[in-house]
């Protein structure tokens, strides 16, 4: 499957099972490449990517929101400088949303911007954060406080890599697809009520929703704010728990449940979240969130 995104810099999203082993069909094997990944990404995936590009350097950071820091950013940029990376070279993100944010901001910052390709490896990043051009790091405990809008050259998605995700991580990422269904695509929402989840279709339809919104409002001046449904309260929960205990999708689920007014839709959402083993109860005090 191929999705073309039209914005300040057009790019394509490719969605295909087994794509990770065919990257050489999409990327020039002779390019000098700085691959940023983390220690949560299975080593077999990192080796599968790096072995296809003889002129690549694999830089692995510690997983978690702590990777989105000035210290890690500086380390990445310093490593690139020491290895004589130029404006003609390429940064690849191989990981989840944190790695996409970090690597994208590294690419946007180095020599005023070099090419960037995103290869998302988590449900959340394949469904949501790999499209839209938002790249950022955190500051003083505030998520995404320093960043830019920087579009990738392309996004390459292999649904098969999701098979190695822990169940909680897998389900956590699906919340963004549920959100996309609620704001724009009734049929996407209904996919979660079927007996078996069609993950490839869920990813595809979720990307189409975000593509439509991003093309209308790339820099979040109006319509794109609809993508923040559930996120205002969700981010408050994330701050309350100091980015621990609850994952991003779980916090967004709490936010959506808190803001939904239609009792029928709220009940359907509750059943879907229960099926995905996402707890919508928490011990946070409302006056502290």
Residue positions per predicted region:
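Glycine-rich beta-strand-to-loop/alpha-helix junction loops that act as flexible
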Residues: 63-64, 94-96, 229-230
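Short glycine/serine/threonine-rich phosphate/pyrophosphate-binding segments
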Residues: 98-104, 126-127, 235-236
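Active-site and donor-binding regions of nucleotide-sugar-utilizing enzymes
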Residues: 85-117
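Active-site segments that bind and position negatively charged phosphate/pyrophosphate groups
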Residues: 191-287
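Short glycine/proline-enriched coil/turn segments at helix->beta-strand junctions
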Residues: 28-32, 51-57, 112, 195-198, ...
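ATP/NTP phosphate-donor binding region
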Residues: 1-90
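A glycine/threonine-rich phosphate-anchoring loop and its flanking beta-alpha core
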Residues: 14, 28, 105-194
């Amino acid at each position: 499957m191929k999705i073309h995104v039209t914005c300040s810099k057009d790019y394509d999203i490719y969605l295909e099972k087994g794509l990770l082993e065919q990257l050489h069909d999409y990327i020039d094997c002779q390019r000098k490449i700085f691959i940023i990944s983390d220690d949560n990404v299975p080593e077999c995936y990192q080796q599968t990517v790096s072995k296809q590009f003889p002129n690549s350097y694999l830089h692995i950071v510690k997983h978690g929101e702590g990777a989105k820091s000035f210290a890690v950013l500086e380390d990445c940029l310093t490593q690139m400088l020491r290895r004589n990376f130029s404006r003609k070279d390429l940064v690849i993100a191989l990981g989840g949303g944190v790695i996409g944010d970090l690597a994208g901001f590294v690419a946007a910052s180095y020599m005023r911007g070099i090419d960037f390709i995103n290869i998302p490896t988590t449900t959340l990043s394949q469904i949501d954060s790999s499209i839209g051009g938002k790249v950022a790091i955190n500051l003083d405990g505030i998520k995404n406080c320093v960043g830019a809008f920087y579009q990738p050259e392309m996004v390459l998605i292999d649904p098969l890599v999701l098979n190695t995700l822990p169940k909680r991580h897998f389900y956590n990422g699906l919340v963004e697809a549920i959100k996309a269904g609620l704001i724009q695509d009734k049929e996407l929402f209904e996919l979660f009520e079927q007996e078996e989840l069609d993950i490839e279709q869920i990813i595809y339809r979720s990307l189409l929703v975000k593509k439509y919104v991003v093309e209308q409002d790339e820099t979040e001046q109006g319509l794109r704010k609809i993508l923040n449904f559930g996120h205002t309260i969700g981010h408050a929960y994330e701050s309350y728990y100091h980015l621990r205990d609850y994952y991003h999708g779980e916090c967004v689920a709490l936010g959506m449940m808190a803001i939904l007014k239609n009792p029928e839709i709220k009940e359907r959402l509750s059943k879907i979240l229960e099926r995905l083993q996402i707890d919508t109860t928490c011990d946070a005090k409302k006056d502290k969130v």
